[in-house]
């Protein structure tokens, strides 16, 4: 038994090391790749200082943090709701952030600065989160809370659709691009949004013990002495914050929060002591690679990153499911 535990521990360490190396390679490639390839030896030349440090680095850091936040949010939701299909958009938090951002674009007639749009997106996500916490205070079961989140998401989606019909052509272009996700407008002015993600990411990665209990189910978690109501509220609030900030940075990006935790579980990473940091590393790597494809796929334009994540990831996910079912 002790030998098996040691073997599992070594395997977990190997997985984390491999994911760390993958993330570093993706980070390096993201800084080098673009319309002009800039090798690390040229990073400190005048051209490198402009393209790498002023343009590519803030974008790369934003992609890394958003990928980590979405993947960890998916892992938290899948444990919290005991549903492998749970992901950041399921509770309506992503759509709530979208409603806040779209309201800011329409009411501000496209004149509001980026920081104001970011605050509105975060406010929309937190409003939906507060509504969910209100439901949670009524001690609803996990399945009912999940259904409440789905209903809120549908309402927010309907509001966004109505907003598109009433928008002008300029606003419509901005809204449609946002709904497909993208990091094209990210620069150092959004650094405050990046910093807002870091403490919550680190805190959640340290909460493996309650997460492991939640993954056992509500009844088992209560029997083990976990204050279920408290942890459910805290985790929903933390997830709402991360998703709101992510939407403010890059718009709506699907697939990462759904598939990354599921893929890692299929690979044997079920302990949240390993799964949570693994999701952060794998989510960051996956979104970095998707962003590189989005930048380089077309010569004259940039693809929406949400389209890239779905196109590249869905076949891999189906293949893994078929492989696991054999």
Swiss-Prot record:
Which SUPFAM superfamilies does the annotation name?
ABC transporter involved in vitamin B12 uptake, BtuC
What Gene3D superfamilies does this protein map onto?
ABC transporter involved in vitamin B12 uptake, BtuC
Q: Name one GO molecular function term.
A: ABC-type vitamin B12 transporter activity
Q: What's in the keyword line of the UniProt record? A: Cell inner membrane, Cell membrane, Membrane, Transmembrane, Transmembrane helix, Transport
* Organism domain of life: Bacteria
Q: Which cysteines are joined by disulfide bonds?
A: none
Annotated TM spans: 11-35, 57-81, 93-107, 114-138, 142-166, 191-206, 229-249, 258-267, 275-296, 305-324
What processes in GO biological process is this protein linked to?
cobalamin transport
Membrane topology value? Multi-pass membrane protein
Q: Where in the cell is it found?
A: Cell inner membrane
User: Pfam families in the record, alphabetically?
Assistant: FecCD
- Cellular-component GO terms for this entry: ATP-binding cassette (ABC) transporter complex; BtuCD complex; cobalamin transport complex; membrane; plasma membrane
**Main localisation:** membrane
Q: Cross-referenced CDD domains, in alphabetical order?
A: TM_ABC_iron-siderophores_like
Q: Which residues lie on this side of the membrane: Cytoplasmic?
A: 1-10, 82-92, 139-141, 207-228, 268-274, 325-326
**Residue numbers on the Periplasmic membrane side:** 36-56, 108-113, 167-190, 250-257, 297-304
Per UniProt, subunit arrangement is: The complex is composed of two ATP-binding proteins (BtuD), two transmembrane proteins (BtuC) and a solute-binding protein (BtuF).
| Family according to the record | Belongs to the binding-protein-dependent transport system permease family. FecCD subfamily.
**Function statement:** Part of the ABC transporter complex BtuCDF involved in vitamin B12 import. Involved in the translocation of the substrate across the membrane.
Protein known as: Vitamin B12 import system permease protein BtuC
């Amino acid at each position: 038994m002790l030998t098996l535990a040691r073997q599992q521990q070594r395997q977990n360490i190997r997985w984390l090391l491999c994911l760390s190396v993958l993330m570093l390679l993706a980070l390096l490639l993201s800084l080098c790749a673009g319309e002009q390839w800039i090798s690390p030896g040229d990073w400190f030349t005048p051209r490198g200082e402009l393209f790498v440090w002023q343009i590519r680095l803030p974008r790369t850091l934003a992609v890394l943090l958003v990928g980590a936040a979405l993947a960890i949010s998916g892992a938290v939701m899948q444990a919290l709701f005991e549903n492998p299909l749970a992901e950041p958009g399921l509770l309506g938090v992503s759509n709530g952030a979208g409603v806040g951002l779209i309201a800011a674009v329409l009411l501000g007639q496209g004149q509001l600065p980026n920081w104001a749009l970011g605050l509105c997106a975060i406010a929309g996500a937190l409003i939906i989160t507060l509504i969910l916490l209100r439901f949670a205070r009524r001690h609803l079961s996990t399945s009912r809370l999940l259904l409440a989140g789905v209903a809120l998401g549908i309402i927010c989606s309907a509001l966004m659709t109505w907003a598109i019909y009433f928008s002008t052509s300029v606003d419509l272009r901005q809204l449609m691009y946002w709904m497909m996700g993208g990091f094209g407008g990210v620069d150092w002015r959004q650094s405050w949004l990046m910093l807002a993600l870091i403490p919550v990411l680190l805190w959640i990665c340290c909460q493996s013990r309650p997460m492991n209990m939640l993954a056992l189910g509500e009844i088992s978690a209560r029997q083990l002495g976990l204050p279920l109501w408290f942890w459910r509220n805290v985790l929903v609030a933390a997830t709402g914050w991360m998703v709101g900030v992510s939407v403010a940075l890059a718009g709506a990006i699907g697939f990462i929060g759904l598939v990354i935790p599921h893929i890692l579980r299929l690979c044997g990473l079920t302990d949240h002591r390993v799964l949570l940091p693994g999701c952060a590393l794998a989510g960051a790597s996956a979104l970095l690679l998707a962003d590189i494809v989005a930048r380089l796929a077309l010569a004259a334009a940039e693809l929406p990153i949400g389209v890239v994540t779905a196109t590249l990831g869905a076949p891999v996910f189906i293949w893994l499911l078929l492989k696991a079912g054999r």
